Design a protein with these regions (language model features):
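Intrinsic-disorder-associated interaction segments
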Residues: 1-4, 129-133, 204, 263
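Conserved helicase motor core of SF1/SF2 NTP-dependent helicases
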Residues: 30, 34-122, 142, 149-382
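Short glycine-rich substrate-engagement loop in P-loop NTPases that contacts/grips substrate
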Residues: 121-141
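ATP-dependent helicase/translocase motor core
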Residues: 1-47
Length: 382
């Protein structure tokens, strides 16, 4: 691979042998980087601190990992922190790092980094927000005692929008980086249209605002293209947020299909759609069912089977098990993707947060998208 990469770079600099992060096996394929991706890579070389924005499928995660690869090529002893909020995406990033033997990188979800500082306390009640707040505060106290040699030379944050509303999380990342966010080296990848947390009720502290300012005044770049979705899905995703459709890979697929969400018949409609439509075209392993509702409030909550398949929660660390159908929530599945997606429990698009959840859920589909939505909803923003 190394020799092929050198040949490709010599013949055509914009060609690069890059790990395809969409593949379960991290297949290596020769791809042409888009103009915006090349621009980002050039800016990474020119700036100590860079904020990169881009919509779903624009390659933010791909570029975050490529940033780490290039750093290690130039500085093999560099200590890198690769962080995201989402547990599933964090497990995926950690797996990529292990498989590529990039031992200088500490990759994973934010709370896995907390575990690295103060130890893993095992399974906890995920709804207990006070527990997680305390974990961050304990990790922050430990991090403040680290020597410079124990801190990161480079911090790479994926899905950075998930951290903006939490000053203590930002402070922990600030402390973990040599020179902090003000003088250290960092790359911050985000999409502000994917902020799913409720509007904060309290004003940010002065320290919180100062850390946000450091992100917002840094050099910035934009990833313009959508490489994940078909034209049909990209059109639907753009419509729900009132956004212009970004240039895509010009892959055309089936039209986005919508079924009615009827009160007290939500599960029956999901089962009918899956058994009579989706499973006729796609294998269960290629399908993910996402709910707009939180854990325990999904239309399939409390059910064991669906269309003759055993319902299991999606877990990227586990291989698909025959005879099952995988389910998750929009919030948990952020940063991930699937060949076919059924997005259900779409009962409201009245708030910006509702639309953002639909935007995130819909954009997880690479080729086929099915929606189960309350009739009469306005899909066009504004």
């Amino acid at each position: 691979v190394g020799q092929l990469e050198k040949i490709a770079h010599k013949l055509r600099p914009e060609l690069r042998l890059t790990a395809n992060l969409s593949s379960e096996e991290v297949d290596l394929e020769l791809i042409r980087l888009s103009a915006s991706q090349l621009h980002v890579l050039e800016m990474l070389e020119q700036n100590k601190r860079l904020r990169v924005t881009g919509g779903p499928g624009s390659g933010k995660t791909l570029m975050a990992v490529e940033t780490c690869r290039r750093e290690l090529e130039l500085n093999p002893t560099s200590k890198i922190g690769l962080i995201c909020f989402n547990r599933f995406l964090g497990a995926f990033l950690a797996d990529v790092v292990v498989r590529e033997k990039m031992t200088q990188i500490q990759a994973g979800s934010f709370y896995s980094h907390c575990d690295g500082l103060i130890g893993n306390r095992g399974k906890v009640n995920e709804s207990d927000s006070s527990y997680f707040v305390q974990r961050v505060r304990e990790a922050l106290q430990v991090a403040k005692k680290l020597s410079p040699d124990e801190k990161y030379d480079l911090l790479v944050v994926d899905e950075g929008q998930d951290f903006r509303d939490d000053g203590e999380m930002l402070e922990l990342m600030d402390v973990l980086l040599k020179g902090g966010l003000a003088r250290g080296r960092w790359r911050w990848f985000e999409d502000l249209d994917q902020v799913l947390s409720p509007e904060p009720t309290d004003q940010p502290t002065q320290k919180h605002e100062a850390l946000l300012d450091l992100l917002d005044v840094a050099a910035s770049a934009r990833l313009e293209n959508n490489w994940r979705n078909t034209e049909q899905i990209a059109q639907a995703v753009g419509k729900v947020m009132g956004l212009p459709v970004k240039p895509t890979a010009r892959i055309f697929g089936p039209q986005v299909s919508t079924a009615p969400l009827v009160k007290d018949k939500e599960f029956a409609m999901l089962e009918a759609l899956l058994s009579k439509v989706v499973l006729k075209d796609y294998q269960p392993k290629d399908i993910i069912i996402l709910s707009m509702h939180g854990a325990g409030r999904e239309s399939y909550a409390g059910k064991d089977t669906l269309a003759g398949l055993r319902i299991v929660s999606y877990d990227p660390s586990r291989a698909y098990e025959e005879g099952t159908i995988r389910v998750s929530t929009v919030f948990k599945f952020k940063g991930m993707e699937s060949h076919a997606v059924i997005l259900t429990d779409i009962d409201s698009l009245g708030s910006v947060r509702d639309r953002r959840k639909a935007y995130v859920g819909m954009s997880r589909a690479k080729y086929a998208l099915y929606l189960i939505a309350k009739e009469g909803l306005s899909w066009g923003r504004g």
